[in-house]
């Protein structure tokens, strides 16, 4: 990589199943990885020798299921005891354990048991995306705009920002995926001037968002947003997998439920079948020697696939209804319905959506896999002053808070301070008071959600307002100030108004929230892992070079014509040097330097022998 630092910021779509990176240098470019793929699997694998990220990790998943981690986005910012986490754990081959209420992934790496937070796994994927960009740009990348589902809550957003920090990136902004896609659509279609209402339908590998935007004169205003942070292509694959498991059991009497390798192979076949059925109406699924020597073969029609996922497909229309209701807009007022996310390629999903909008033609002008990274790169260029075109220079994004924010009041009633779909950044205030005479401390639990009962919302943290002057109940005026920044991340402060003094306020750490010390430690660990990866790669290359050189010299020595030209003494010396080189290759954990020395030693003897012929 060349010297120098890239002045702009890359855009990263950190996906559940695949990630994508884009850069802006006079125009947007989606950057392909070393395999030539424009999307990279969000997979990290750990082996006794090395760590693999992306295609290399996914390709060996069936051979190493327990140490191949994916779906980190379905864990990030969540509690271990959440229902979705518990359900997912039943389908994952890797181990997830409870550490102080947070889910932590446990794997075997370099011969040891290691634990990684979802933030660390995500940071490894982000590092990979950063390296893909650096290889193309030829400069060091330090800044990024990272996207998240619009429906991500505060904890999930903060955890994603932390993952960026662990990977060594300065995360300039966390932006919502459908909003990023809207930028790609607006710019790509050259339609950012015409005033219109656009509905972004974003169904990816693991998450689902619907956002309704008003676009006019380069100003993108999100009117409302809804979704499901736990719905996507993975769930359709799981339903297919369950169906195939049943078929296999019916035919053979064998249950593969506890065999991680067989499950991985069958899931891969299910995913392939799902993709195929987007373009044909029938396919055959074959897996040789799936379990206990038995092959698996089944035919699958598109109709059967649709039937297996009918309830999930239908559920995608609920957030569509919700955003229209929240924005107080009728479906006839929607000018365009834009498809984003790989799962929108499914014909049945498209038909349901088109029918809902009375046969409206859906907008497919943008690449559903790349649109989000495209929009993030544009936002990165704007934030770093690198955007050059008139279209992007004047572009303004006005997004919203996806879920209401507020405090728990007496009787566990949720007191909303920031209603959902409030444009961010925003500052909202609400006054509270004491419930007991001479009360000097009030505890404010901060929640995010839409339910009246606090217990059914997400607890983000708690703070104590202390040193309140003793007064009769109901007299003190306590003002809670909720500040939501452009990333959708919350900061809460409080003031005791009657004396004009601001009071101490600390938000205690929410479960799984990383402190700055934690992040620093993880940054250092990430550097160590990277160094270990590089050392392994160098060692592997040096060993391969030595092996191929040894093979070519062995050929020379054993070739009657070539060896007859060598002096007897020279041939003996070469054979001795060859034996030394072969011994070096036998060393299990030889270093790159040892292999290099063995190669140099052998070359020296060979060169001398050849020149003295």
From Swiss-Prot:
Key word Nucleotide-binding present: yes
Keyword Protein biosynthesis among record annotations: yes
Catalytic activity: ATP + H2O = ADP + phosphate + H(+)
A single Gene Ontology CC term: fungal biofilm matrix
Binding site for ATP: 16-18, 73, 205-207, 271-278, 342
Keyword set, alphabetical order: ATP-binding, Chaperone, Cytoplasm, Hydrolase, Nucleotide-binding, Protein biosynthesis
Region called Inter-domain linker, residue ranges: 392-402
Region listing for Substrate binding domain (SBD), in residue ranges: 403-613
Gene Ontology biological-process annotations: translation
Function (record text): Ribosome-bound, Hsp70-type chaperone that assists in the cotranslational folding of newly synthesized proteins in the cytosol. Stimulates folding by interacting with nascent chains, binding to short, largely hydrophobic sequences exposed by unfolded proteins, thereby stabilizing longer, more slowly translated, and aggregation-prone nascent polypeptides and domains that cannot fold stably until fully synthesized. The Hsp70-protein substrate interaction depends on ATP-binding and on allosteric regulation between the NBD and the SBD.
Protein name: Ribosome-associated molecular chaperone SSB
Source species of the chain: Candida glabrata (strain ATCC 2001 / BCRC 20586 / JCM 3761 / NBRC 0622 / NRRL Y-65 / CBS 138) (Yeast)
